[in-house]
Design a protein with these regions (language model features):
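Short, well-structured alpha-helical patches and their helix-loop capping segments
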Residues: 92, 128-132, 163, 284-287, ...
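C-terminal hydrophobic structural anchor segments
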Residues: 270-323
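Short, solvent-exposed loop/turn segments at secondary-structure junctions
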Residues: 76-79, 119-122, 286
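Beta-barrel outer-membrane channel/assembly domains of diderm bacteria
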Residues: 2-110, 138-151, 175-179, 223, ...
């Protein structure tokens, strides 16, 4: 006879009728034409892709907020893009975010669920985490004057045989240097637990490896204990709003190919055009490849090169963007 024991803690949020005035709604839609010329492949690739997201915020009390967002999805951890094909299939919609935010005090918040990434990333850096990645777990955000901190406990899989945890701590300082300049700097530790006990086939959303080194059994060769230094300076350059940014990572659990960085500049030109340039070099085991930027170098690690962004707001709610990647895959 098998014996099954189960324990659960259940949080129920009850509400009466909800009207439109009770909800803070947000929506975005993006169409993207994508052209890829990979010298390692015989053919170029052309794709038409869409991403749409619909979210809502409900304030249950002065201290408790509920956030829900649905998005197009292909079971991809780091992308909400849907590729338009000729199969006339229906696009998938998934739960992109669903979390509670509770104000423990004036300067301390608790987040629980599948949440918006709570960690500071200079100029929305995607060196470690893709912008579409929404972690699942528990997080605290704290502020005290010019000091801020973020603490997270992220879960990757509910199966006890494949459980991987990400424990994270970020401490930072934000300072208004003068009327035109603001600086923000942080140091973070992202500690993945037991990744090197598994192969990508049981960890990543599609079972593929994203640039990290593997051992003879097909498991990850190294675990990942990441040290991350981030810097962002907002100022004025020739009367134009400018942002300088630097993001660096080192995996102390790897013996080699353990470092990565990106650095760049963002300029707002004539109140309309926005131009961003960055250079990135991300070695094979500097970070967990399945979570880093899914577009740079085709996704994953072991890439270096340039990225150019040019954005023009046609109206307040409609913009046109051009992004150019000139990347090289490192040979090992």
């Amino acid at each position: 006879m098998n014996k099954v024991t189960r324990a659960a803690v259940i949080l129920c949020l009850f509400s009466g009728p909800v009207t439109a005035e009770d909800l803070d709604l947000n929506f975005d839609f993006r169409f993207r034409y994508e052209y890829t010329d990979d010298s390692g492949k015989a053919d170029t690739r052309n794709r038409n892709r869409i991403r749409t997201r619909l979210g809502a915020k409900y304030s249950a009390s002065e201290k408790l907020d509920l956030f829900v967002r649905f998005a197009t999805a292909e079971e991809n951890t780091t992308s909400g893009n849907q590729t338009l094909g000729t199969g006339f299939t229906v696009s998938d919609i998934g739960m992109d975010q669903m979390y509670l935010k509770y104000d423990l005090s004036k300067n301390t918040d608790l987040l629980f669920g599948k949440m918006k990434n709570p960690f500071f990333k200079p100029n929305k850096s995607e060196l470690i985490f893709d912008g579409d990645y929404n972690p699942k777990g528990l997080a605290f955000t704290l502020k005290h004057g010019e000091i801020f901190s973020n603490i997270g406990y992220i879960k990757f899989d509910e199966n006890p045989l494949q459980t991987i945890d990400l424990r994270s701590l970020q401490v930072g300082w934000s300072k208004n240097i003068n009327d035109l300049t603001k600086a923000k700097i942080s140091f973070a530790i992202y500690d993945f637990d037991k990744l090197n006990e598994f192969s990508p086939s049981v960890i990543t959303f599609n079972g593929k490896n994203f640039g990290n080194s593997l051992d003879d059994n097909g498991n990850y060769l190294y675990d990942f204990s990441l040290k991350n230094l981030s810097l962002e300076i907002k100022t004025s350059l020739m009367s134009m709003p400018a942002t300088f940014f630097l993001d660096m990572v080192k995996n102390s659990d790897a013996d080699q190919n353990d470092s990565g960085f990106q650095s760049g500049l963002s300029l707002v030109i004539s109140d309309k055009w926005k131009f961003t340039y960055l250079y990135k070099d991300i070695e094979s085991d500097s970070t967990f490849g399945a979570l880093t930027h899914s577009d740079f170098g085709g996704g994953g690690t072991n890439h270096k090169g340039h990225q150019f962004n040019l954005s023009y707001p046609v109206t307040k709610r409609f913009s046109v963007d051009v992004v150019w990647f000139d990347n090289k895959k490192k040979m090992t």
